[in-house]
């Protein structure tokens, strides 16, 4: 039976308990690894038996599930990419009139939800969930928010996109599963609507991208006539883009909201993580339902998961019925830590560095837009924090110098602006090994993001 609920909690814990499911979340690493291996063997057999796509995937690799008799053998299986999944989706639609027929493993009458990746770099990739899979997702959201302090009786304002975004409906359902109330305002109505509902509902918690969170801080005085920190918000949960773990961005969010800030990841699937008060990486909370690997971007060669290792994230879902991903990569580059955490909890921690397809190469230096943002944040309020990397043509290779369009802070002009530019260029050179050419624009010039921030602009696009 693939729908193994043995590590899902039944009923809610006492509000005084620190963890939603302590028997699983505090499981020693060696015991968790044994559990993963047992579930992996069942998962591989299940997808082979249930999916024409996965049978072909195994056959083309010259392997069968029973051949995967070690973790090393598992890493020799091919890596699935979004392109592979999109192609299977298109082929199934063309051949059968059914976009789900090739990769869905569960009987269709057991499917209760269709999720999709964001589709920011192409056609959205669809994946299906059964009621069991939804229960797994709900559990993982509850684990994250419970350990951050959210409890039944609290109210969370959901300010992420609700339009097929994996952090939309699934996240809202997870909040309800914990026993808290959700205000699913979303971002599609803009910042004014979000702020008005924050005033009306007085939530204790808000979830949004870091960029949109900072935009709310900026807009609140004009919209509500008060600072956002005056609304009594206690938690801000950052999601959807890198930034929530960056000390400078976290500090601005803490000050703007008057709240504790937690970075976290995980929407409608089995990969979930959240920071603890130590802010030394996000704790991987879903290891009982997801195997995490690292590989070299571009080559797919395994990267040992050791303290400080960095690589492209590869995930495999465990005890998952609908559309289980096996050795799937969606392009996220992460850094991991395996040593003890000051909070006392075992297991792996990680931070999201960026997306592999967002990486730029400037004179041989690999550069993620999030790293540029992190340096700029250190100069706030002399800069607003809003910027664009301007490219003559799509990356990853960039003809030097790297062009930055940066909003200056209010009142920063003349000699003060010249000094700021010299300091900024020096910091970029020292920290990122890149010397940019800076174009200054007035405060408020660049569009403010409502969903995931777009920091790269290709001249002539649109």
Where do the language-model regions lie?
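Nucleotide 5′-phosphate-binding alpha/beta core
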Residues: 1-116, 122-139, 146-147, 403-405, ...
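Conserved ATP-dependent adenylate/AMP-binding module captured primarily in the ANL superfamily
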Residues: 137-155, 190-203
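Conserved AMP-binding loop of ANL adenylate-forming enzymes
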Residues: 146-178
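Conserved helix-loop-beta element of the AMP-binding
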Residues: 155-157, 223-243
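ATP-dependent adenylate-forming carboxylate-activation enzymes
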Residues: 182-198, 368-371
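AMP-binding/adenylate-forming catalytic core of the ANL superfamily
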Residues: 206, 314, 318-434, 440, ...
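Adenylate-forming
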Residues: 212-231, 251-255
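Conserved AMP-binding/adenylate-forming
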Residues: 238, 243-245, 249-340
């Amino acid at each position: 039976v693939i729908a193994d609920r043995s590590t899902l909690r039944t009923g809610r814990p006492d509000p005084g308990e620190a963890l939603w499911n302590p028997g699983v979340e505090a499981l020693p690493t060696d015991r968790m690894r044994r559990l993963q291996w047992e579930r992996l063997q069942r998962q591989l057999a299940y997808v082979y038996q249930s999916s024409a796509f996965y049978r072909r995937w195994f056959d083309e690799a010259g392997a069968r599930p029973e051949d995967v008799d070690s973790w090393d053998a598992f890493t020799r299986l091919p890596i699935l990419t979004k392109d592979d999944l999109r192609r299977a989706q298109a082929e199934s639609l063309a051949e059968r009139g059914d976009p789900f027929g090739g990769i869905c493993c569960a009987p269709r009458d057991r499917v209760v939800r269709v999720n999709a990746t964001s589709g920011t770099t192409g056609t959205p990739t669809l994946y299906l969930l059964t009621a069991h899979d939804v229960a797994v997702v709900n559990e993982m959201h509850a684990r994250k928010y419970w350990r951050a302090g959210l409890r039944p009786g609290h109210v969370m304002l959901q300010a992420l996109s609700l339009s097929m975004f994996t952090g939309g409906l699934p996240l809202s359902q997870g909040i309800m599963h914990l026993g808290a109330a959700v205000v699913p305002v979303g971002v599609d109505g803009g910042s004014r609507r979000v702020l008005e509902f924050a005033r009306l509902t007085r939530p204790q918690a808000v979830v949004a991208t870091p960029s949109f969170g900072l935009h709310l801080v900026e807009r609140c005085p004009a919209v509500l006539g008060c600072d956002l920190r005056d609304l009594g918000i206690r938690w801000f949960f950052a999601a959807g883009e890198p930034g929530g773990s960056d000390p400078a961005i976290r500090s601005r969010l803490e000050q703007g909201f008057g709240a504790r800030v937690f970075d976290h990841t995980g929407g409608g699937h089995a990969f979930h993580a959240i920071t603890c008060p130590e802010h030394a990486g996000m704790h991987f909370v879903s290891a009982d339902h997801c195997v995490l690997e690292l590989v070299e971007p571009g080559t797919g060669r395994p990267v040992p998961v050791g303290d400080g290792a960095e690589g492209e994230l590869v995930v495999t879902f465990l005890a998952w019925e609908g559309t289980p991903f096996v050795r799937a990569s969606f392009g996220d580059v992460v850094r991991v830590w395996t040593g003890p955490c000051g909070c006392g909890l075992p297991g792996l921690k990680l931070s999201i560095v960026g997306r592999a397809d967002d990486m730029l190469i400037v004179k041989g230096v690999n550069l993620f837009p999030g790293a540029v943002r992190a340096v700029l944040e250190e100069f706030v309020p002399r800069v607003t924090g809003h910027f664009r990397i301007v490219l003559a043509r799509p990356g990853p290779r960039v003809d030097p110098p790297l062009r930055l369009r940066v909003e200056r802070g209010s009142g920063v002009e003349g000699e003060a602006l010249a000094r700021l530019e010299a300091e900024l260029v020096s910091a970029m050179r020292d920290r990122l090994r890149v010397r940019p050419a800076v174009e200054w624009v007035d405060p408020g010039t660049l569009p403010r993001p409502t969903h995931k921030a777009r920091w790269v602009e290709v001249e002539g696009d649109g």
